[in-house]
Amino acid sequence: MIRLILHLFLFLFLSSYSCEAYRFSSSDQKVLNSFWKYAEEHRLGNLPVNERIPSIARFFLGTPYQSNTLNVTREELPVINLHELDCVTFVENVLALAFLEQYNQQSTEAFVQNIIRLRYRNAEIVDYTSRLHYSSDWLYEMQQAHLLTDITQFAGGIPYSKQICFMSEHSQKYPQLQKDSSLLKKIKTIETAINQRTYYYIPKDKINEACNKIKNGDIILITTHIKGLDTSHLGFAWKKEGKTYLLHASSKGKQVMI
């Protein structure tokens, strides 16, 4: 079991939005079909959302880890990949499934709608910069849309003062920004907006106290010392025998694990 290293955490709630064209493979459909059966067996539709989240997250235990699964199309599309996950897509997929009103084949489009609502600014896909690349930007936009409640400050958080500029200063790492200078300008504008906001984090010496306020299924964001970057990892809180663990897609473990 991996002990939790907590710096930021929050709880989400979601509603649906209109659907766009999306990429969905036969492998993903197989996973989704298995999930419909799992949802029926576990009566997920009868559970409140906060209890669905940890149950759905457990469904993905053992799913292989794979980074960079969203940048596989020339144009920005809501790519769906359920058979390979990184820490971000794991959280996205679990939440998108948790907020479905029903669990059957007819819910596929609603699932994609939820992905769009979680992944893109104002649930609109214009270009690469529509995607909420920075966790802090995602946090802000979800709150603005009244989809998320950030309890970090309430749990003893202090202001998180850091200049966010990783994408613009490392644009060579992002082919989309290299190909289109206008997108790089948009990213710089987004970074400027992020740096004008106030965010909070939980210092290491306050983690044990904060863990008492965490509930099973809450989302955890982990800050980073990397210059210009806000967070480096995220997952779900998993509570067991009074202790808090992280249920996440692990790059080191190469799978979804606790």
Segments predicted by a language model, with ranges:
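Mature, folded catalytic cores of secreted/periplasmic enzymes
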Residues: 34-37, 48-51, 100, 201, ...
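Short, structured beta-strand/loop micro-motifs enriched in basic residues and often containing a Trp
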Residues: 197-204
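Cationic-aromatic interfacial patches
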Residues: 21-92
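Generic detector of well-ordered alpha-helical segments enriched in charged/polar residues
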Residues: 29-40, 50, 54, 58, ...
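Accessory, usually C-terminal, subdomains that scaffold auxiliary metal cofactors
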Residues: 205-258
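Acidic/His-rich structured neighborhood in mature extracellular/periplasmic domains
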Residues: 65-195, 215, 222, 239, ...
